[in-house]
Curated annotation (Swiss-Prot):
Catalytic activity: a 1,2-diacyl-sn-glycero-3-phosphocholine + H2O = a 1-acyl-sn-glycero-3-phosphocholine + a fatty acid + H(+)
Principal cellular location given in the protein's record: secreted
PROSITE patterns xref list: PA2_ASP, PA2_HIS
Note: Displays 20 times higher phospholipase activity than blK-PLA2.
The keyword Disulfide bond appears for this protein: yes
Family: Belongs to the phospholipase A2 family. Group II subfamily. D49 sub-subfamily.
Cofactor(s) the protein requires to work: Ca(2+)
Keyword Nucleotide-binding: no
GO biological process: arachidonate secretion; lipid catabolic process; negative regulation of T cell proliferation; phospholipid metabolic process
Job of this protein: Snake venom phospholipase A2 (PLA2) that does not inhibit platelet aggregation. Exhibits cytotoxic and anticoagulant activity. Induces Ehrlich tumor growth but not angiogenesis. PLA2 catalyzes the calcium-dependent hydrolysis of the 2-acyl groups in 3-sn-phosphoglycerides.
UniProt-recorded name of the protein: Basic phospholipase A2
GO terms for MF: calcium ion binding; calcium-dependent phospholipase A2 activity; phospholipid binding; toxin activity
Organism of derivation: Bothrops leucurus (Whitetail lancehead)
EC category: hydrolase
Amino acid sequence: DLWQFGQMILKETGKLPFPYYTTYGCYCGWGGQGQPKDATDRCCFVHDCCYGKLTNCKPKTDRYSYSRENGVIICGEGTPCEKQICECDKAAAVCFRENLRTYKXXYMAYPDVLCKKPAEKC
């Protein structure tokens, strides 16, 4: 669920998901349109695509099982939906960590009106 995703982000990046990732660029947070602004925003675009490929799942509310071992997120047992949601969230949290050095504070609370270009396809 979104709370678990937030905890993954915090552990991976050391940053609070709100406000650092909830309104970043064109794809972090609710919805998304246009072209991703940078590598961090692309993490959100890919995460949105990952959620979009799930069928009959509720990624924002379905809880899943995971742990961290030696700093690595391990998705645990559960339904196929729970496992897939966990893998989507894990990939995004790791992506955020890998792109911390290019994170731009100017893309926080980025206005949607500036995300007008045609959206990329997943």
